[in-house]
Amino acid sequence: MIRDISIALREGTPEWPGDTPFACRWATLIANGESVNVSAVIGSPHVGTHADAPLHVRDGWPGSHELPLEAFVGPATVVDVSGHSGVIEADALGYDPEANGERLLLRTGRTIAGGQFPNEWPTLSEACVRALVGRGLRLLGVDAPSVDTRESKTLPVHHMLFSGNAYILENLDLRRVPTGPYELIALPLKFMALDAAPVRAVLRDVQG
């Protein structure tokens, strides 16, 4: 079974406050006598389900076209942390990259999937992130708008992950996904030298 864990991208999809919202217009329409329908879109690449690039948090770091595809395909584990608030420590996860796959997907329950931008969401502690990266974490995905807190200006989790060659997915839709192991496929679009890239993220059930 393939499970779509991407947020539907449409006008009105909540954007990070201050970001350019997603918008679409029709450049040509068959109804107006044109031979084809052609649309044009505008918006921040952080609207909807996306992969952050290291360039997002530091000048000179790799852009969206340099994201390593292998980080976004492979074994992943969905962990439910919706009962938590504030900072989550490693012992509360019950997850080990060496035993459970190198990609961790957190269901916080604070998601834009319902049409509202959340005020807050739980995040991993810096010690937790350091420990996970040290044990081989390749990717952290969240259903929340960020792996850091809404108020953070220094974005320590972003910096620690990118410094450890681990990557980031944000705004996943994990509402109907049971916890446990999956195969993740979430390839970033090849936008050149941007701070993020949209993805169509899916999970494939693990057989046996």
Specify the residue positions occupied by each region the protein language model found.
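Active-/binding-site microenvironments in catalytic and ligand-binding cores
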Residues: 1-208
